Amino acid sequence: MKKILTTPIKAEDLQDIHVGDVIYLTGTLVTCRDVCHRRLIELKRPLPYDLNGKAIFHAGPIVRKNGDKWEMVSVGPTTSMRMESFEREFIEQTGVKLVVGKGGMGPLTEEGCQKFKALHVIFPAGCAVLAATQVEEIEEVHWTELGMPESLWVCRVKEFGPLIVSIDTHGNNLIAENKKLFAERRDPIVEEICEHVHYIK
């Protein structure tokens, strides 16, 4: 059975979700990456859209005009770690509950998710066209002067995913934990290989 989060998301909706879980999103998803984060955190410019209880997507979409509406063509995830220095404050200031992106994030985001009850989730890379099919409608767009990839595209989505939980509200970080685990497994293997190839200069 699918675990589907629907916006507006509340803290209690997230308490039983853990790293490694696969979830889906229905409701509001707003594309929001580097420049929007900088505007809010560094320049202290308020966002033109209320993200409280909503979800953001680290993504630079391709959209096209269809009559008087915008249509999503492709929307693939951007590397989330680019937003690491801003994300904790961003979560605190906006009340956003779901941060969607590519790859993991670090200790600042981990702290923000635990303290302010949010999740970071990973959307599979290479599936930008699939993601676009899960966007039912682009409802609004803001900060268009930043260009298509950096604008805030307010999308209505249905069962958007799959989304793999990488940071949960309990302070667990799937990618960081996996790095430690893989390093522990790697070291004895490397030592064994070195014993067999020590003669190679």
From Swiss-Prot:
Recorded superkingdom: Bacteria
SUPFAM superfamilies: FumA C-terminal domain-like
One of the record's GO molecular function terms: L(+)-tartrate dehydratase activity
Keywords: Lyase
PANTHER family according to UniProt: L(+)-TARTRATE DEHYDRATASE SUBUNIT BETA (PTHR43351:SF3)
Protein's recorded name: L(+)-tartrate dehydratase subunit beta
Pfam families in the record: Fumerase_C (PF05683)
Primary enzyme class: lyase
Cited Gene3D superfamilies: Fe-S hydro-lyase, tartrate dehydratase beta-type, catalytic domain (3.20.130.10)
Stimuli inducing this protein: Induced by tartrate, via TtdR.
Gene from which this protein is expressed: ttdB
Disulfide bonds: none
Residues the record marks as active site: 37
Coiled coil, from the record: none
Family classification: Belongs to the class-I fumarase family.
NCBIfam families in alphabetical order: PRK08228.1, ttdB_fumA_fumB
Record note on quaternary structure: Heterotetramer of two alpha and two beta subunits.
